[in-house]
Amino acid sequence: MGQVFLLMPVLLVSCFLSQGAAMENQRLFNIAVNRVQHLHLLAQKMFNDFEGTLLSDERRQLNKIFLLDFCNSDSIVSPIDKQETQKSSVLKLLRISFRLIESWEYPSQTLTISNSLMVRNSNQISEKLSDLKVGINLLIEGSQEGILSLDDNDSQHLPPYGNYYQNLGGDGNVRRNYELLACFKKDMHKVETYLTVAKCRKSLEANCTL
């Protein structure tokens, strides 16, 4: 009986520590989801504003090219649909999100278009991406006590954005900016989806369907 009483304080402390860790985890998830939602909305607005500067024929042509082309980050293997996203583990979703955010650290600094909104928000975007990357890394470290299971994809190196479309003709800058903004919007939507599903899983909610 005496041993039971001695163990009770230890169990209570362990329980409180576990609850504290869970609350901190949810706090980090809330911050990460809020930040990527803001980035996604900002990306959507910048893309729409840029499209607004183009003629109708230009928009249609660029959209056709974009649908046939690919984003720099497409080399990062990620779920192809909602079903695959739902089946992916929390750690896998976090790792993919980390790689997607990491892939935009450099191009977010090199986007130079006449759109005044983009010029005004370029530094803000870079800072938010860096903060989000740090936050996701903390979530990854807490998912398996810092022991990561790296996929083969994590060792891949993305082609540099510095040489992106360097051989295009006179309209190259317009096409480059269109595709960069479209890809940025697409990738932020991906990360928002992955982090939202991961957050739901960690909160033990009954329904985490998209």
Swiss-Prot record:
Chain sites annotated for binding Zn(2+): 38, 192
Annotated signal sequence range: 1-22
Gene Ontology cellular-component terms listed: extracellular space
Pfam families, sorted: Hormone_1 (PF00103)
Gene Ontology terms: biological process: animal organ development; calcium ion homeostasis; growth hormone receptor signaling pathway; hyperosmotic salinity response; magnesium ion homeostasis; positive regulation of growth; positive regulation of phagocytosis; positive regulation of receptor signaling pathway via JAK-STAT
Subcellular location: Secreted
Molecular function in Gene Ontology: growth hormone activity; growth hormone receptor binding; metal ion binding
This protein's record includes keyword Nuclease: no
Disulfide bonds: 71-183, 200-208
Gene3D superfamilies: 1.20.1250.10
Protein's UniProt keywords contain Kinase: no
Protein task: Growth hormone plays an important role in growth control and is involved in the regulation of several anabolic processes. Implicated as an osmoregulatory substance important for seawater adaptation.
Family as reported in the entry's similarity comment: Belongs to the somatotropin/prolactin family.
PANTHER family: SOMATOTROPIN, SOMATOTROPIN,PROLACTIN
The protein, known as: Somatotropin-2
Organism annotation: Oncorhynchus nerka (Sockeye salmon)
Gene: gh2
